[in-house]
Amino acid sequence: MAKKLYIETHGCQMNEYDSSRMVDLLGEHQALEVTARAEDADVILLNTCSIRERAQDRVYSQLGRWRELKLANPEMVIAVGGCVASQEGAAIRDRAPYVDVVFGPQTLHRLPEMIDAARVTRLPQVDVSFPEIEKFDHLPEPRVDGPSAYVSVMEGCSKYCTFCVVPYTRGEEVSRPFDDVLSEVIHLAENGVREVTLLGQNVNGYRGTTHDGRVADLADLIRVVAAVDGIDRIRYTTSHPLEFSDSLIQAHAEVPELVKHLHLPVQSGSDRILAAMKRNHTTLEYKSRLRKLRAAVPGISISSDFIVGFPGETEKDFDNTMKLIEDVGFDFSFSFVYSPRPGTPAADLKDDTPEALKKERLAALQHRLNQQGFEISRQMVGSIQRILVTDYSKKDPGELQGRTENNRIVNFRCDNPKLIGQFADVHIDDAQPHSLRGSLLQ
């Protein structure tokens, strides 16, 4: 009987990508098959996120639930990876001594040998080092699971925003070689992928070296990926305003495969708070970039990230954030109450804003962002949208679902499963809070 792998992933798209590569790696080297039940597993992997405090607490809660499984089956291997593992290293075993393997985002390629070593030696295996980007040299070709796929183009971040742990958990920015990324995209396209999302913590800072020694930026990469036969839609995330270049704006205007949607985190609408965050740009500079983009690509959808309650945030600072929201007109966006991350400069700042006030501000901000996002959805009613059909509807097996360019789920009646993995034109009939309803055009 084949041995089983259970994997749970917390956090961002980069973690989702890493988890998929771990599945590929362990499938090839140890013939592990994925199971949906942790209690059936021979190996349990937890790929963690440390962006927010509650995410970190969630790690230890989950490990605590698996303790009984380990006691019942001592041969089971429990491995913890991702950013919490990178940040805490061997200290994870202080709170969860039954964990066998601890590895970081840059050492996931060592998983097979670490698991084997844990079994043979009965000793914990810990490697949270930063061997730059060598992990990609040890990973098998990615398996294809549906018409959409993530492709990691770079690792780490060198911006060192004062609130963020990424430079400490994933290391400095390192771009994958241009031709390696292209080879992965070609492989995916040859196996039925129609849409790729190019990933990086600061993806528009991509600087990949080509086979002839030239340095290519993200705009160069997008143009070449768009020319790959079978790739009809390109997304990328996450971007930093500082490196949202004119060449990237030009690519948005000239490359039809690049979606009319941009996720560009701003975090705050207060220049004072942006400076304290070490974002190194102003709200005026942010809006200037977006004005230039919208002039080049009318109707493009803009989403963002917001942090509410950063240390020292005043009522005026928050009002400036709300003003920025009105000035820009965002699509559905992500927003959170600030939580201090150990080891970051912001964790040492005085935070005298009451938690109740932070939550009140967050509720007001989310309410307005949701209003703006729903208004964009409402304006789409009556339009014809080209969607990539991805799966059956989650609520009705007689319906299929797909995504628009601006990342909205569309559910529509259809009895032809062969449409999954293809593009289709759908008339938008109705806007709902978290999705759209449509009718397939024949």
UniProtKB/Swiss-Prot annotation:
Domain MTTase N-terminal as annotated: residue spans: 3-120
Binding site for [4Fe-4S] cluster 2: 157, 161, 164
Subcellular location, record wording: Cytoplasm
Disulfide bridge map: none
Family annotation (CDD domains): Radical_SAM
Cofactor (UniProt): [4Fe-4S] cluster
Entry annotated with the keyword Iron-sulfur: yes
GO MF annotations, alphabetized: 4 iron, 4 sulfur cluster binding; metal ion binding; N6-isopentenyladenosine methylthiotransferase activity
Domain TRAM: 378-442
Gene behind this protein: miaB
One cellular component (GO) term of this entry: cytosol
Subunit structure: Monomer.
HAMAP family, per the entry: tRNA_metthiotr_MiaB (MF_01864)
Protein name, as recorded: tRNA-2-methylthio-N(6)-dimethylallyladenosine synthase
Entry EC no(s): 2.8.4.3
Ranges for domain Radical SAM core: 143-375
